[in-house]
Design a protein with these regions (language model features):
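C-terminal amphipathic alpha-helix
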Residues: 663-687, 724-769
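Bacterial N-terminal signal peptides
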Residues: 16-27
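Extracellular/periplasmic metallocenter environments
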Residues: 545-546, 608-664
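Histidine- and aromatic-enriched segments that form or immediately flank copper-ligand environments
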Residues: 167, 583-613, 636-644
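Predominantly soluble domains enriched in secretory-pathway, periplasmic, or organellar proteins
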Residues: 33-548, 617, 753, 761
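Bacterial N-terminal signal peptides that target proteins for export
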Residues: 3-18
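N-terminal edge beta-strand
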Residues: 549-579
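Amphipathic, heptad-repeat alpha-helical segments
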Residues: 662-718
Length: 769
C-alpha cells in the first residue's frame, strides 16, 4: 500500500517539475532560441531544401493528406505510411508470423495463416508485390486491401476497418504468379495472373513438352463485399499459352468489362546453363515484341457460370478452345519485357512500356474494340488465339528513355508518369499528344512508381513516390544489406521536384497505392469479445467476474480477462503434461490500450487490442514455475501486471502453505488508503465538472474517453465493496489491499479523464450552460 502512495507522489513531483521547466524555458532570453536563418546557415541548407522541408512537414498532432500501402517484398507484409510526411505508420502482417501483432501466435490468426497452406505444408513466408485497394465506381473506397504472394501463388484480404489480414487463398492451379492483385471497378473480381508456365494443377511434365503441356493463365477471384471475403466457389480461371503472364489492369468507363494482362518470354524459351544452353534472359528477349492479352472478363464470367469449364483441383477453368470459340481472349504485340499495363482514367487508352524498349506504347481502346468487332485480325498464335496487328491498335509511341517500366496518371487530363529503370529517372509525358514534357533524376534504378489515386478514374495528382531498387549512398551505412529508397516527388506544378528520401528498412517493396486519408475509417476498439479475424463475437468472450479455470482430464481451460493493471486469473495451476488453453478478453474501452500476454519459456505470445478475445495454447510438458506478464506497457503499474503458471511435476504431493504476507496492514493503513480514495474521487469529480461544463459531445474522441473513464470507475465499485466488507470483519490487511485496488481503478479513470480535459483545452472547446 505504501509503495502505491509513493508512486503517486513521484508522479505528482514529475508533473510539477515538468511544468516548472516549461515555465523557465518560456521566460529564458530569446537569444537561446535559434532563428530559421541560423538553422539554415548552420546546417548548410539551400532555399530548395527549406521549401522541400516545408512541403513535407506535418506538424505534431496533425495527420497526412494521403496514406500509402506498399508491398513489403520478402517481409511478407504490407507497409503503411503517410504522404507527404513519409512517416511509417504500420507493418501489416500478412503471409508470415509477426510477434508484435501476435499474428501466427494466437489460435485465431493461426487459422488465417493455415488458409495459405499448400499441399499440406505450412508456408511461413511470402513475397508481397502488388497491393490493390477496393474500388467503387472506379475509385478507391477505403474498405479493403488485397495483396499477392509471388513466391507461393496466393492472395490475401486485409480489412481496413482494423488493418488486419482476414483471409488467404492459395491458387488451386498455378505454380507461381506475379500479376496480382488488381480489382475491377466495383471490386466484383480480383485478378491473379500466372507467371512462370507449368502444367495447370501441379502435375509433372518434362520440359521437352513445354509447348504442349505447360500453360499460363489468369484467375478471376470473386469478391463477396458483404462478407469481405474472396469466394472460391464463384471464381474461375482462363487457360492461356505458356507465355509468362505478368501484370494486369481492368478496363474503366469506356473499356468496362474488359481486362488486360502483359506477358514476357512469348518465345516460350527454356534455358539451362548447366546443359550448355543460353540462359533464360537471352532466349526470353529474342523477339522484338511480346503479347498483350485482351480479355472479355464479363463474358468469361457468363461462360464459367454456364458450366463451359474444365474442373481442375475443384476449380473452374475455361480452356483455350472454349475461349477461342466464345471470343474471350485476343492478343496484341507489345514492347518486349513489359512490366505494367495501365488503363487511363477515362478508359480510352492503355499504356505499356517494355524494359527493353525506349518507348512507351499507347493503345487506343476504340481501335482495339473496332478490330475485335470487325474480326480484323493479322493472324493467330500457335494455340489459335487471334492476334490484332500492332498498327491497328496503336494510338502513338513516345520515346521516354532507357528502361521504361510502370506508368501512373495525373489529375491533369492526358498527363502520365513513367519510371525509367536504366536511366534512373521519372518521365512526365502527354499520352494523348505523344510528347515528353519533363524528366527528373532519382536515386537509384526506379522500379514502380505511385501517384495519389493514380490508377483510378479520378487521380488526385499532387505527389508521386518513386519506389527505387537501390539506395547506395543516400542513407547512413548499415552494412552490405541496404534499405530501399522511396523518394517523394512534387508533381503539383509544371516541373517535377524531389522532396524527400524515405528509407524502407524491412523487405524490398515493389508496387504501392495511395488513398486520401479521409476515405479511411478505421475503428479504435472492438465490441467486447470480438474474434478480430472473423469479426464475430467469440464463444470464449469473458466479462469481469466470469473468469474461471476448468479441468477435463488432462485438458485445462482458462477464461480470463485483461485490464489495467492485472490479468485475471493471476495464478494458473496445472500438472505436467496438461494441455493448456487460455482464452483472454481485453476489457479496456480506451483508445490505444492494448495488452500483451506471454508465458516464460513456453513460446506463448499474444496481443489484445481493446475488446478483443483471442486464445493461446501450449502443452505444459516442463514442470516448474513460469511467470507470465503483459508485454505491452499500459500503466504506471505495468510491471505488476503479472502472474504465474505453476506446472506441478508428476507425482507431486501438495504442501499446505500460507500466501498471507508476514507484515500485516493495520486499521491505520486501511484508513490512509480510504482517505487517498476519497481525495482521488474529489479530483475525478473536478475533472468531470470541467468536461461536462464544456461542449464535449461535439468531440468524438472525448466522448469515447468519457465512456471509458465511466466504465473504469464502475469497476471500482467491486473492490470498494469488498474493502468495506473486510473492514467490517476487522480484517484490515485484506481490506487495505482491496482498497488499494479500488484506488487503482480510480487512478485509471482519472488518467483517462485528464486526457479528455487536455484534448478539450487543446481543441478549443466552449463552455455550455
Amino acid at each position: 500500500m505504501h509503495s502505491t502512495r509513493t508512486v503517486a507522489r513521484r508522479l505528482q513531483r514529475l508533473v510539477v517539475g515538468a511544468i516548472a521547466a516549461v515555465a523557465l524555458l518560456a521566460a529564458a532570453p530569446s537569444a537561446t532560441a535559434q532563428t530559421l536563418q541560423q538553422v539554415v546557415k548552420e546546417r548548410g541548407l539551400t532555399q530548395q531544401d527549406v521549401l522541400a522541408a516545408a512541403k513535407t512537414y506535418v506538424p505534431t498532432g496533425k495527420r497526412d493528406e494521403f496514406v500509402a500501402f506498399s508491398s513489403g517484398g520478402q517481409s511478407g507484409m504490407v507497409i503503411v505510411y503517410g504522404v507527404p510526411s513519409m512517416r511509417i505508420l504500420k507493418y501489416i502482417a500478412v503471409f508470415n508470423p509477426e510477434p508484435w501483432q501476435a499474428y501466427g501466435f494466437d489460435e485465431e490468426s493461426k487459422a488465417v495463416l493455415d488458409q495459405g497452406r499448400i499441399n499440406g505444408k505450412d508456408i511461413t513466408w511470402g513475397d508481397t508485390h502488388h497491393p490493390a485497394l477496393s474500388e467503387t465506381n472506379g475509385d478507391y473506397d477505403g474498405q479493403y486491401l488485397f495483396i499477392n504472394d509471388k513466391a507461393n501463388p496466393r492472395l490475401a484480404v486485409i480489412d481496413l476497418h482494423d488493418f488486419e489480414t482476414k483471409q488467404i487463398v492459395a491458387n488451386p492451379i498455378f505454380q507461381s504468379q506475379h500479376g496480382g492483385a488488381f480489382v475491377s471497378e466495383n471490386t466484383e473480381y480480383v485478378i491473379e495472373a500466372a507467371q512462370y508456365a507449368a502444367p495447370l494443377g501441379g502435375a509433372y511434365a518434362p520440359l521437352e513438352r513445354f509447348n504442349e503441356d505447360y500453360r499460363g493463365g489468369v484467375t478471376y477471384w470473386k469478391f463477396n463485399r458483404e462478407k469481405g471475403r474472396l469466394d472460391a466457389s464463384q471464381s474461375f480461371s482462363l487457360e492461356l499459352p505458356p507465355y509468362s503472364q505478368d501484370l494486369s489492369d481492368f478496363g474503366k468507363l469506356a473499356s468496362t468489362g474488359w481486362s488486360f494482362t502483359n506477358s514476357f518470354c512469348s518465345e516460350r524459351y527454356v534455358g539451362g546453363i548447366e546443359r550448355g544452353r543460353p540462359p533464360f534472359e537471352a532466349g526470353c528477349s529474342a523477339k522484338d515484341t511480346d503479347y498483350l492479352h485482351v480479355i472479355n472478363w464479363k463474358k468469361a464470367a457468363q461462360v464459367a457460370a454456364a458450366g463451359k469449364v474444365k474442373m481442375i483441383n475443384g476449380h473452374k477453368v475455361i480452356m483455350m478452345d472454349t475461349a477461342i470459340k466464345e471470343g474471350l481472349v485476343f492478343l496484341i504485340p507489345e514492347p518486349k519485357s513489359p512490366h505494367g499495363v495501365d488503363v487511363t482514367p477515362d478508359g480510352d487508352y492503355i499504356t505499356i512500356s517494355g524494359k527493353l524498349d525506349s518507348h512507351s506504347y499507347v493503345y487506343s481502346w476504340k481501335k482495339i474494340k473496332a478490330a475485335i468487332d470487325a474480326k480484323n485480325f493479322a493472324g493467330k498464335d500457335p494455340y489459335g488465339l487471334p492476334i490484332i496487328d500492332l498498327k491497328t491498335a496503336l494510338h502513338t509511341q513516345v520515346p521516354l528513355g532507357l528502361g521504361p517500366l510502370h506508368t501512373q496518371y495525373d489529375s491533369k487530363k492526358g498527363i502520365a508518369y513513367t519510371s525509367l529503370y536504366v536511366d534512373s529517372m521519372v518521365a512526365r509525358w502527354d499520352y494523348i499528344n505523344g510528347k515528353l514534357l519533363d524528366r527528373l533524376p532519382i536515386h537509384y534504378n526506379i522500379g514502380h512508381l505511385m501517384t495519389m489515386h493514380g490508377d483510378t478514374v479520378k487521380p488526385r495528382g499532387k505527389y508521386l513516390v518513386s519506389l527505387n531498387k537501390l539506395a547506395i549512398d543516400r542513407f547512413q551505412p548499415v552494412g552490405p544489406l541496404h534499405p530501399q529508397n522511396h523518394q517523394l516527388i512534387d508533381i503539383g506544378g509544371n516541373k517535377m521536384s524531389l522532396l524527400y528520401d524515405m528509407p524502407v528498412p524491412l523487405g524490398e517493396p515493389h508496387y504501392s497505392v495511395a488513398i486520401e486519408a479521409s476515405l479511411l475509417k478505421p475503428g479504435i476498439r472492438y465490441k467486447v469479445g470480438t474474434n478480430t479475424r472473423t469479426g464475430e463475437i467469440s464463444p470464449h468472450k469473458t466479462r469481469a467476474g466470469e473468469e474461471r479455470t476448468e479441468r477435463s482430464g488432462n485438458k485445462v481451460t482458462v477464461h480470463g480477462t485483461l485490464i489495467r493493471s492485472h490479468i485475471t486469473p493471476e495464478i494458473i495451476e496445472v500438472n505436467e503434461g496438461d494441455e493448456v488453453t487460455i482464452h483472454l478478453t481485453n476489457l479496456e474501452r480506451a483508445q490505444d490500450q492494448t495488452h500483451g500476454f506471454t508465458v516464460s519459456k513456453y513460446n506463448v505470445n499474444g496481443s489484445w487490442e481493446p475488446g478483443k478475445t483471442a486464445t493461446v495454447k501450449f502443452t505444459a510438458d516442463v514442470p516448474g514455475v513460469f511467470p507470465y506478464y503483459c508485454t505491452e506497457f499500459c500503466s504506471a503499474l505495468h510491471l505488476e501486471m503479472q502472474g504465474y503458471v505453476l506446472v506441478k511435476p508428476k507425482g507431486y504431493k501438495a504442501k499446505v502453505g500460507d500466501l498471507m504476507a508476514k507484515d500485516q496492514y493495520t486499521q491505520a493503513d486501511y484508513e490512509k488508503q480510504v482517505k487517498a480514495c476519497v481525495e482521488t474521487q474529489a479530483v475525478i469529480d473536478g475533472v468531470v465538472g470541467f468536461i461536462t461544463g464544456q461542449n464535449y459531445k461535439d468531440f468524438a474522441p472525448v466522448v469515447a474517453l468519457v465512456e471509458d473513464a465511466t466504465e473504469q470507475l464502475g469497476y471500482a465499485e467491486g473492490p470498494k465493496g469488498k474493502a468495506e466488507e473486510e473492514a467490517a470483519k476487522g480484517n484490515y490487511h485484506s481490506a487495505t489491499l482491496w482498497a488499494g485496488q479500488w484506488w487503482q481503478y480510480q487512478v485509471k479513470a482519472a488518467d483517462i479523464g485528464l486526457r479528455a480535459k487536455t484534448y478539450l483545452e487543446q481543441h478549443g472547446s466552449k463552455p455550455v450552460k
